[in-house]
Design a protein with these regions (language model features):
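Short glycine-rich His-centered loop
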Residues: 1-17
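Hydrophobic/aromatic residues located in beta-strands of well-ordered beta-sheets
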Residues: 37, 130, 189-190, 325, ...
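A general structural detector for well-ordered alpha-helical segments in enzyme core domains, enriched
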Residues: 26, 87, 111-122, 149-154, ...
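A structural motif corresponding to the C-terminal lobe/cap of the Radical SAM core domain
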Residues: 8-11, 158, 303, 336, ...
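Short catalytic helix/loop segments, enriched in acidic residues and glycine
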Residues: 15-30
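Glycine-rich beta-alpha loop elements in corrinoid/cobalamin-binding modules
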Residues: 26-29, 36-46, 50, 71-211
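Radical SAM [4Fe-4S] cluster-binding motif and immediate context
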Residues: 221-417, 439
């Protein structure tokens, strides 16, 4: 796993890295196939070796397009060799048969660039095949016109760049290499990206599988949360659920990150516990126009069998000695039948676990939510997006706002925390539409734990990206290019810019036909984000300030 600059940007993350589910899925699948798999997360090396500003400067070369291009083409650069060798010095990887590099999933250009450089180094140093994957590959491919120069560079050197789920693709590559299969057959494997007659073309991606993750021989101590020691104490369990489920912990200064630091530095009644990520359904039966899940190849749900999923959960609970899970499905309640069966079985066997997941308001009743609570549900995150009926209809959200309110109240009564996702800046969102969103939030503020504020950006393979005129907009595709993004990210890395990393995903702009232009939309969005931010529950900022102060006391 290539390292991300988020550890430099969000220093509290040093106190608990995020365990990568993709590595676990790969490990689980390939080990079941009989492969001896060794996995290494170079973010751990980043934590151990490169904490200060002087060492941070070593990474600035990664953003240099000329050095990047020269190294991929020639493999000759003493500075880059030195940086990579320093990263790999504590690992014995010289005698493996084949190598893989993940370039991550969070739009990090350090992670992307470093990952490709690392793959080139390994290829030259060990003279072995290297495959490259990670969700950032899908991001780069979706915006392949923006990143055409990068694709031309890396596809000139690497045969096995994988788009989409990689586990079966890797298995096929290895089998075909062992059988001395010709290059034409190798290049036709599903998921492989090729450069053909000046075009960047991905073969159809593999369908995802429900796989029990297994992180093999990785040192998982870096991913643990510093929890209050429980000893069957209901009070301690309640505290831990507040700290690590109720309180947000994914952004700079978030109270969840700070409390983890405080527990580690200041408390003695603590123990380290993993919260295991696990996914058991893919794709989405709905067709929200803004979402990448509205792509034509993602409408068919791939869902796990309740008995098999529970079997996986039990195995993960026992192997990693934890009752805590983050389920990472698009919608836990994609199927009422699955929900009822899964929850009843957990209750019947008295399986003690705590979990959170995403959900849809649709098909949820008080009784079903009560069942979920008894089965260990702690928090649900719902895609609310907008309180405007006009916007809901435009994006084909298919939610009933009255029912959504009832679900929020039921969750509150049952003790399930609810986060909601809000999107600002959707096409044709005017003052009256935004005000409807604010009114819904204010009306239901008592029942909403936290709301995630997302600024809309166009995804090319979504319905809005494919048919912009239907949504009253025209796309602007030239506001960014690869070189400009590298320059902007270097400035951010050096703290010369206050852009957040997720701005890397906002690569297309748009004008509304006969209404607002792009600049006006961006200006409106800033005001909306500011207003919504001021509506958040004050509990989180107050707790963050309090525990930050306690951490700083000598």
């Amino acid at each position: 796993m290539s390292p991300s600059e988020s550890l430099f940007q969000y220093t509290e993350k040093i106190y608990a890295l995020s365990i990568n589910l993709g590595l676990g899925v790969l490990g689980g699948y390939l080990q079941d196939k009989g492969y001896n798999v060794k996995m290494r997360d170079l973010n751990i090396t980043l934590v151990n070796k490169y904490k200060d500003e002087n060492s941070k400067k070593l990474f600035e070369i990664v953003f240099d397009i000329n050095k990047f291009k020269n190294y991929i083409f020639t493999g000759n650069d003493i500075e880059i060799d030195s940086l990579i060798e320093s990263f790999l010095s504590e690992y014995d990887i010289a005698n493996e048969d084949i190598y893989g590099v993940s370039i991550g999933s969070d739009f990090s250009f350090l992670q992307i660039q470093f990952g490709f450089l690392l793959a080139k180094y390994i290829k030259i140093k060990f003279n072995k095949h290297v495959f490259i994957g990670g969700n950032n590959i899908s991001f780069l491919y979706i915006f392949k016109d923006v990143f055409k120069e990068m694709w031309e560079i890396v596809l000139s050197e690497f045969k096995f760049i994988i788009n989409g789920p990689g586990e079966r693709c890797i298995d096929e590559i290895i089998q075909d290499l062992n059988n001395n299969t010709n290059s034409d057959k190798l290049s036709s494997i599903n998921g492989i990206i090729n450069y053909i007659d000046g075009e960047i073309i991905s073969n159809p991606t593999m369908k995802p599988l429900i796989i029990k993750p297994d992180w093999g021989d990785m040192d998982l101590s870096y991913y643990t949360k510093c929890m209050i020691s429980e000893n069957d104490s209901e009070k301690a369990i309640k505290e831990n659920l507040i700290y690590f489920y109720k309180w947000p912990d994914t952004f700079a200064g978030s109270v969840g990150q700070i409390i983890n630091k405080y527990n580690k530095l200041r408390r003695s009644d603590v123990s380290n516990k993993l919260i295991i990520p696990y996914i058991f359904n893919y794709n989405c039966p709905y067709n929200c126009a803004f979402c990448t899940q509205s792509d034509i190849d993602r409408s068919s749900i791939i869902g796990g069998d309740p008995d098999e999923v529970i079997k996986d959960v039990i195995a993960l609970k026992e192997k990693y000695n934890t009752n805590y899970f983050y389920f990472l499905n698009n919608a836990f309640n994609f199927s009422p039948k699955f929900v009822d069966s899964f929850c009843k079985k957990i209750i019947d066997i008295n399986l003690e676990i705590h979990w959170s997941d995403c959900g849809r308001f649709n098909n949820l009743t008080y009784e079903r939510l009560e069942l979920m609570k008894k089965a260990g549900c702690v928090k649900l995150t719902f895609g609310f997006e907008s309180g405007s009926l006009k916007i809901i209809e435009l994006i084909d959200k298919r939610i009933n706002l009255d029912h959504a309110e009832r679900v929020l109240k039921w969750c509150y009564e049952l003790g399930i925390w609810v986060d909601i996702e809000v999107i600002v800046g959707l096409p044709q969102e005017y003052d009256e539409d935004f005000n409807a969103t604010c009114e819904f939030i204010n009306k239901n503020k008592k029942y909403i734990n936290y709301f995630w504020i997302n600024e809309f950006f166009v995804v090319p393979n979504s319905l809005i990206g494919r048919y912009p005129e239907k949504y009253g907009i025209e796309l602007i595709k030239d506001i960014n290019n690869y070189r400009k993004l590298l320059d902007n990210n270097l400035k951010m890395f050096k703290r010369e810019s206050d852009n957040v990393m997720t701005s890397n995903s906002k690569l297309f702009g748009f004008n509304e036909i006969n209404r607002r232009n792009f600049d006006a939309i961006v200006s409106d969005n800033r005001k909306k984000i500011s207003k919504l931010s001021n509506m958040q529950n004050s509990e989180f900022n107050e707790a963050a300030k309090f525990y930050t102060m306690l951490c700083e006391i000598k």
